[in-house]
From Swiss-Prot:
This is Mediator of RNA polymerase II transcription subunit 21. It comes from Homo sapiens. SUPFAM superfamilies: Mediator hinge subcomplex-like. It is found in: Nucleus. Interacts with PPARG. Component of the Mediator complex, which is composed of MED1, MED4, MED6, MED7, MED8, MED9, MED10, MED11, MED12, MED13, MED13L, MED14, MED15, MED16, MED17, MED18, MED19, MED20, MED21, MED22, MED23, MED24, MED25, MED26, MED27, MED29, MED30, MED31, CCNC, CDK8 and CDC2L6/CDK11. The MED12, MED13, CCNC and CDK8 subunits form a distinct module termed the CDK8 module. Mediator containing the CDK8 module is less active than Mediator lacking this module in supporting transcriptional activation. Its main location: nucleus. The gene is MED21. Component of the Mediator complex, a coactivator involved in the regulated transcription of nearly all RNA polymerase II-dependent genes. Mediator functions as a bridge to convey information from gene-specific regulatory proteins to the basal RNA polymerase II transcription machinery. Mediator is recruited to promoters by direct interactions with regulatory proteins and serves as a scaffold for the assembly of a functional preinitiation complex with RNA polymerase II and the general transcription factors. InterPro entries: Med7/Med21-like, Mediator_Med21. GO terms for cellular component: core mediator complex; mediator complex; nucleoplasm; nucleus; ubiquitin ligase complex.
Length: 144
């Protein structure tokens, strides 16, 4: 996962892309300007233009990206953050990391126990198959 500044940079780049795409699509799909009722007869023959739908779509995308940028900015550490606050935050993160490591060790231990049981069961199955095959071979051999 990228750090917050990289995420913020990516979000700003995405916002710029959305602005460029919105301008391009709206320019391409926009109705032509009318000049003193000359274009009205031509415009009536053309199908309905989805410009309004595009405008709403791009407005929603731009608004969502702007909100994401605000959230990322709010999550950045402020200049008012003192060393004591940063140390407390770091201590809390270390505790959470320790708890997660303990949980992970427990899961790995249980996984190892299950693996041993599975390997033991597979070994028993293999032994049973070998005994069955050797018993079948000895029965199929004619006595001379």
């Amino acid at each position: 996962m990228a750090d917050r500044l990289t995420q913020l940079q990516d979000a700003v780049n995405s916002l710029a892309d959305q602005f460029c795409n919105a301008i391009g699509v709206l320019q391409q799909c926009g109705p032509p300007a009318s000049f003193n009722n000359i274009q009205t007869a031509i415009n009536k023959d053309q199908p309905a233009n989805p410009t309004e739908e595009y405008a709403q779509l791009f407005a929603a995308l731009i608004a969502r990206t702007a909100k994401d940028i605000d959230v990322l900015i709010d999550s950045l550490p402020s200049e008012e953050s003192t060393a004591a606050l940063q140390a407390a935050s770091l201590y809390k993160l270390e505790e959470e990391n320790h708890e997660a490591a303990t949980c992970l060790e427990d899961v790995v231990y249980r996984g190892d126990m299950l693996l041993e049981k599975i390997q033991s069961a597979l070994a028993d199955i293999a032994q049973s198959q070998l005994k069955t095959r050797s018993g079948t071979h000895s029965q199929s051999l004619p006595d001379s």
